Regions:
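Short, charged/polar micro-motifs that form catalytic or ligand-binding hotspots
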Residues: 1, 18, 22, 34-38, ...
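Basic/polar N-terminal segments that are highly enriched at the extreme N-terminus
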Residues: 1-3, 152
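Conserved short "hinge" loops at termini or chain/domain junctions
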Residues: 3-6, 10-33
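Short, compositionally biased low-complexity segments
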Residues: 4-9, 49-58
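Generic structural signal for hydrophobic core residues of well-folded globular domains
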Residues: 12-18, 36, 52-56, 74, ...
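Amphipathic alpha-helical segments that form the core helices of the histone-fold
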Residues: 27-55
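Mature-region segments of soluble proteins
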Residues: 58-152
Length: 152
């Protein structure tokens, strides 16, 4: 795996709380990095990856508060939060106008679903112990289970 791709996965693992192995299992790592490059430009993505704490890039443990510091950073917090949402929901959320004015982005920076595969691979489903509605079957024999009473 190219070092840049590995840096993106390492940063994403810290942002999402999922391991690099789990993120690779979604099949979305390359697609999300490509999406990010299409929105921010490769140069801005490289700056973001460079801003991410160095400890995560090696075998050393991430310093406590490092992720919070990145999320709260005025320069890199907005794209870091958008990346986190992309992993969980399979959607890109448009960056704030002030950030866009300062850093510049491409026209692709709009609220949008990255792809149908991204929706299905969203970490929200794993976190909730659910399946993507309308995209995956519930499992063999699920038709035989009684309908859940939503009133209770």
């Amino acid at each position: 795996m190219p070092p840049r791709h590995q840096l993106f996965v390492d940063m994403s693992a810290a942002l999402t709380g999922f391991s690099p192995f789990q993120l690779h299992g979604t099949g979305m790592t390359a697609a999300y990095l490509t999406e990010l490059d299409a929105i921010l430009t490769e140069d801005l993505v490289d700056q973001l990856l460079a801003a991410f704490p160095r400890a995560v890039h090696g075998s050393a443990a991430l310093e406590p508060g490092a992720v919070d510091a990145l999320l709260e950073d005025p320069a890199w917090g907005p794209p870091a939060r958008a990346i986190t949402l992309m992993w969980y929901c399979g959607t890109w959320t448009r960056l704030p106008d002030a950030w866009r004015a300062e850093h510049g982005v491409r026209d692709h920076d709009t609220d949008h679903v990255v792809s149908t595969a991204a929706y299905q691979a969203g970490l929200q489903w794993v976190a909730a112990g659910a399946h993507p509605i309308g995209a995956r079957q519930q499992g063999f024999g699920s038709w035989s289970f009684p309908v859940e009473d939503l009133a209770s």
